[in-house]
Amino acid sequence: MRSVGNVDLTIGLVTVPVKMVGVSESHDRKASMYHPHEDGNFGKIKMPKLCEDCGEVVPTADIAKGFEEGGDIVILTADELASIAAATGAALEVPQFVKAEQINPMLFANENIYRLVPDPKRGRQAATTYLMVRHILVSQELVGVVQYTRWGRNRLGVLDVEPSDDGGVLVIRNMMWADELRSTEGIVPTNVTEDDIDPRLLPVMASVVESMTGDWDPTAYTDRYTEQLSEAITAKAQGDEIATVASESGKAIDDVSDLLAKLEASIQKKAPAKKATARRKKTA
């Protein structure tokens, strides 16, 4: 496991030395930009760091971090930025415990999650304290509110327990700050209410949902885009031609009868067939 840093988890006067490790790795196929040459070679495109004022390419060593303030540019040195981070504290400080359901789940929309691993260099006490914190969170059904500074930003998160075969792993789930979550004003229609829903539709919709309800199995879902992208890359590398397919947009629902028919048809169609990869062999 690759650690992103060693840090102290502090709860009151209790300190648990831990390592923060990422929980995921991307399986996306990332494209790079190339310049095709007539001789069949490809030159990788590199982005120069251009100064928009003088137009010159600027070496990384000559680049400073600045912030706009009242129409001016304020430059902060690396030492100044480091001192700000140090002043706000790098420890995972837990000032409060709350019930998980009290937190708006939308605050986790852009979350990063880090697992906390007891630092093996700090002995048995670190490990037993780790287990004690885990026990309290699980037994009292609480999460800890966490505030810490990392990578040049003060961050808010929750200390939670990820279920696992060995009793659970402590995790930090980053949250947005309250003022970073956009308002819901203007999203929900105000020209109609639930009283305007046709009474024939609700029981049929409920049946559709019931027919699609089951136990959660994350392995049942795969990244179809990445799978087909990989197949297309392999096919083209072998000389096959990739057929282009126009995207399909859903047909508009004209009236209640049309919607009712679609809902009833949905009950009969519980498991849609997997689409075949859109490609064909290159013809001579």
Swiss-Prot record:
<dbReference type="GO" id="GO:0003690">
    <property type="term" value="F:double-stranded DNA binding"/>
</dbReference>
<protein>
    <recommendedName>
        <fullName>Protein Ku</fullName>
    </recommendedName>
</protein>
<comment type="subunit">
    <text>Homodimer. Interacts with host LigD.</text>
</comment>
<keyword id="KW-1160">Virus entry into host cell</keyword>
<dbReference type="Pfam" id="PF02735">
    <property type="entry name" value="Ku"/>
</dbReference>
<comment type="function">
    <text>Required for replication of viruses with short cos ends (4 bases). Stimulates dsDNA end-joining by host LigD. Binds dsDNA with either blunt, 5'- or 3-overhangs, protecting it from host exonuclease degradation.</text>
</comment>
<keyword id="KW-0945">Host-virus interaction</keyword>
<dbReference type="InterPro" id="IPR009187">
    <property type="entry name" value="Prok_Ku"/>
</dbReference>
<feature type="domain" description="Ku">
    <location>
        <begin position="10"/>
        <end position="189"/>
    </location>
</feature>
<dbReference type="GO" id="GO:0052170">
    <property type="term" value="P:symbiont-mediated suppression of host innate immune response"/>
</dbReference>
<keyword id="KW-1090">Inhibition of host innate immune response by virus</keyword>
<dbReference type="InterPro" id="IPR016194">
    <property type="entry name" value="SPOC-like_C_dom_sf"/>
</dbReference>
<dbReference type="GO" id="GO:0099016">
    <property type="term" value="P:symbiont-mediated evasion of DNA end degradation by host"/>
</dbReference>
<dbReference type="GO" id="GO:0046718">
    <property type="term" value="P:symbiont entry into host cell"/>
</dbReference>
<keyword id="KW-0238">DNA-binding</keyword>
<keyword id="KW-0899">Viral immunoevasion</keyword>
<keyword id="KW-1256">DNA end degradation evasion by virus</keyword>
<dbReference type="InterPro" id="IPR006164">
    <property type="entry name" value="Ku70/Ku80_beta-barrel_dom"/>
</dbReference>
<keyword id="KW-1253">Viral genome circularization</keyword>
<dbReference type="GO" id="GO:0099009">
    <property type="term" value="P:viral genome circularization"/>
</dbReference>
<dbReference type="GO" id="GO:0006303">
    <property type="term" value="P:double-strand break repair via nonhomologous end joining"/>
</dbReference>
